[in-house]
Regions:
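Helical element adjacent to the flavin cofactor pocket in flavoenzyme catalytic cores
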Residues: 1-50
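Glycine/proline-enriched, intrinsically flexible loops and inter-domain linkers
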Residues: 224-225, 231-622
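Central helical "cap/lid" subdomain
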Residues: 41, 45-91, 491, 506-509
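Helix-loop-beta segment of a Rossmann-like dinucleotide-binding subdomain
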Residues: 1-16, 37-38, 128-137, 190-198
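Glycine-rich phosphate/pyrophosphate-binding beta-alpha loops
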Residues: 2, 99-103, 170-176, 192-206, ...
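C-terminal catalytic lobe of FAD-dependent flavoproteins
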Residues: 99, 108, 132, 136-272
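Mid-domain catalytic core of redox enzymes
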Residues: 66, 80-122, 143-144, 151, ...
Length: 622
């Protein structure tokens, strides 16, 4: 019972010294610079070092007033309550029927019936704001929904047909862009935490959520991998009314819909388009959305590029096979524009990077360093490449989904003043990977790409079409290749050059599915799946990217020093299934158990079908 639970929690909290002020209206979040200072209320000002925003559906507009992005929005939500039913047991589990979007539970001797609408309606859509006095507000009951709800309930719970309905309810409930919670410290204000966006399961999650946020505040980080709940997984555009209102009409129903592998959300699309989006579409690209960008997932050869979801064979396998094999044996084009791009410069830039990064950052123009950023416990907070563009000027490249998270981690841990600039939208990035990439680039741009002139992990500017273009000899698939960073306005000029010559070389346009398979074959790791804040570099096979020889200390060094000579508790390895199954039989994704002598010894982190080895492969900690 939510009411009894809330009362008991408040009583227990008061016994521990917590002060609760009722009928206390928030007027303003107080901050000094980008750090929290307190809250101003109608009962006075409370000065404090930390604030946790737990305002439910009001959280977005409270955050907005303080300059903080909180991506949630309320939709109309329905339930009804029957009359008393004397044969109803007092303790019953919550009943869910995903096929009909229906749920039911015991409620004081009555039956409560609700529905997670497959096509939800926004609340307050005219104003985009929740009224301050709407705590117990209701909407006019939609008779069509109520009739449908009653009919569905009667089919699953026949006794409902003979019970009178005492209460019909329609009210607001807030939802997030991906149906996950919003927790942790915000990127905009230091020590301003959030705990909201529970998508209708806040009561059941309250104990664990409160404990987790409290530990997060005390330690400044969490050793658990909570990125899927961290508010910093989102960017500013995710909380814009244009995005959030449309997206939450879909995510509400998705809670009860089939959770298909590789499912792409359909709402709030085309937020960020690649410079050559139309060209890729003509080439057969099937797009998915990542960090707001429409990214080519695969390229259809002769059919309409759309997903047909399945727990077996995937309809994009044939395209991915062609893309993988042609890239391994010849040449593949990959769009990498959504890569996050930060630039750090100033006299303290190198010193600060040495403190932030576990590896020894090269301070030589054109040199690149693969490294991780750690938390004080030695867990991996970020996976990145740092390139020295010139003295005291560096560019950081990291995964698209980690933009807000990594930016926050860097700025929060800087000890000295530097210039930090997010240049993600200023440059596109094209990956040309495969054994013929050197030959292709030489014919296209000139004799700049020989082994001697362009060693591995080096970068340099070339003047192409009256523009400075940065070429970097790196590849996320373990083949010869270059990443090409182009000023966004010049991208189409260079893309046309690549496209024209690509016909001669049988260049394959390749999507994210192929990239994932190719990197997995070479045991290249993906942050958020294979490495997280729960994993340290030693167990992840990344000890080569940790430098204990550099003079500077770095975040997490003390923790690593304590464990570097101790036996590993687990280790990341690449596995393949012994038998050569057909693609999709079985379909491996992630979190599959690894057995030894009939005992589970680990779980996979990334899995896919390798068309080079013709078998299922996976990365797993054992």
């Amino acid at each position: 019972d939510p009411e009894i639970l809330t009362k008991n929690i408040s009583i227990a909290a008061k016994k521990k010294g917590v002060k609760i002020f009722e009928k206390c209206k928030l007027k303003k979040i107080l901050k000094r610079g980008n750090q929290i200072r307190g809250v101003k209320t109608n009962l006075g000002t409370i000065n404090c070092e930390y604030v946790v925003l737990c305002a439910g559906m009001w959280s977005r507009q409270i955050g907005e007033a303080a300059g903080v992005s909180i991506p949630l929005y309320p939709n109309e939500h329905f339930y009804m309550i029957t009359e008393n039913y004397r044969n109803l047991p007092k303790i019953l589990p919550t009943f869910r029927d995903p096929d009909t979007y229906l749920y039911a539970r015991e409620y004081h001797g009555k039956i409560m019936l609700g529905i997670f609408e497959p096509n939800a309606k926004n609340a307050f859509k005219d104003t985009g704001k929740v009224p301050n006095n709407f705590s117990f507000g209701e909407f006019k009951v939609n008779k069509k929904y109520i009739k449908m709800l009653h009919q569905l309930a009667a089919k699953r719970i026949p006794v409902v047909k003979d019970l009178k309905i005492e209460k019909y309810f329609s009210g607001p409930e807030s939802f997030t862009p991906d149906s996950n919670f919003l927790m942790g410290e915000t990127q905009e204000i230091k020590n301003f935490y959030v705990c909201c966006g529970f998508n209708s399961i806040g009561i059941g999650s309250s104990g664990g959520a409160g404990k987790t946020v409290a530990e997060w505040m005390i330690r400044g980080h969490t050793d658990q991998d909570l990125f899927s709940l961290d508010v910093k997984r989102f960017e500013k555009f995710n909380s814009s009314l244009r995005f959030i209102k449309e997206r939450t009409t879909e995510t509400l129903g998705n809670l009860f819909k089939m959770h298909w592998p590789y499912k792409q959300l359909e709402t709030s699309r085309n937020i960020k388009l690649l410079p050559y989006h139309k060209e890729l579409k003509k080439l057969g690209a099937c797009f998915g959305q990542m960090a707001g960008y429409e990214r080519p997932m695969w390229f259809s050869k002769n059919k309409k590029p759309s997903y047909k979801y399945s727990y077996g064979y995937q309809n994009w396998y044939q395209s991915a096979k062609s893309e993988c094999l042609n890239t391994r044996n010849n040449l593949g084009f990959f769009d990498l524009t959504p890569f996050v791009k930060f630039e750090i410069s100033g006299k303290n830039a190198h010193e600060q990077l040495q403190y932030l990064c576990a590896n020894n950052i090269k301070h030589i123009e054109g040199r690149s360093t693969y490294t991780q950023m750690l938390n004080p416990s030695g867990g991996i907070e970020a996976d990145l490449t740092v390139s020295c563009l010139k003295k005291n000027h560096f560019r950081i490249i990291c995964p698209a989904l980690a933009r807000s998270h990594n930016k926050s981690h860097i700025l929060k841990n800087l000890k000295k003043k530097i210039k930090f600039e997010d240049v993600t939208e200023k440059y596109s990035c094209i990956g040309l990977f495969g054994p013929n990439s050197r030959k292709f680039l030489t014919e296209l741009f000139g004799n700049f790409f020989s082994k001697e002139d362009f060693p591995f992990s080096r970068g340099k500017y070339l003047d192409i079409s009256n523009s400075k273009v940065w070429f970097q000899r790196l590849s996320f698939i373990g083949e010869l290749g270059w990443e090409i960073y182009i000023p966004i306005k010049k991208t189409n000029i260079i893309f046309k050059k690549i496209k024209n010559l690509g016909k001669k070389f049988n260049l394959s346009y390749s999507g994210m599915h192929a990239l994932d398979i190719l990197r997995l074959e070479k045991k290249f790791l993906h942050w958020g799946h294979d490495i997280t804040s729960e994993n340290n570099p030693f167990e992840s096979g990344l000890a080569f990217a940790v430098s204990f020889k550099k003079n500077e200390s770095f975040i997490g060094r003390d923790a690593l020093e304590k464990i570097k000579n101790k036996p590993l508790k687990k280790k990341l390895e690449l596995f393949s299934l012994k038998n050569r199954f057909k693609p999709g039989k079985p379909l491996l994704l992630h979190d599959e158990p690894i057995y030894k002598d009939d005992k589970i010894v680990g779980y996979s982190t990334s899995s896919n079908y390798s068309f080079c080895y013709n078998k299922n492969i996976c990365l797993a900690y054992i």
